[in-house]
């Protein structure tokens, strides 16, 4: 049985595609109403798992200066909190899977490009508060964390917390399971030398993910339960 489960958020535990695309659209309508980014480009950026800075840089370049970056990200987050959160839904089977992990006392972590506050709000709004400890939710502004596939979120953030607060002195990466939907998630798992479950139902580029040969492939969160017990 695994000793730690690390979940991606967008496209893995939660269906957030509409919330992200609509909030990007609202951000442009607010800050640059003369320009509407093509939905196809937004979809590709979501599929790649790009963070907010990279997303707006791709949609705005060369106008995207460091000053503009802060303004656009702050506006996006404000709009996401008031509009985007209402469009987020947990994928079927999320609660059952987290309940199963909790019943076996398997620590659950979330490593996401989202802000921690947005992740916590989504969990609360969807009846999943308390399933994932707050100190195991890693977001884009978590000290020491770096965007996947960089292993820093695991090596420099999760491991110290697990040792200090959960008594996990020795963490065998071979018993860690990363669950995610994009190339970044699969590569992150490879970089920390864990096993990886690719969620084919998510937003990632299917051909690119398949080429990386993930250890497990699922079409629903319900299928992850069997992997956890193996």
Task: Describe each PLM feature range.
Residues 1-2, 7, 29, 99-101, ...:
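Eukaryotic N-terminal low-complexity, Ser/Thr- and Lys/Arg-rich leader segments
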Residues 2-96, 103-104, 117:
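N-terminal helical cap/lid subdomain that shapes the substrate entry/recognition surface
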Residues 86-87, 115-177, 183, 187-192, ...:
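Substrate-recognition "cap/lid" segment bordering the active-site pocket of phosphatases
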Residues 95-99, 182-185, 200-209:
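Short glycine/proline-centered loop/turn elements that form peptide/ligand docking sites
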Residues 113, 200-202, 221:
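Short secondary-structure boundary segments
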Residues 216-220:
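Short acidic-hydrophobic, aromatic-tinged amphipathic segments that line or gate anion-handling sites
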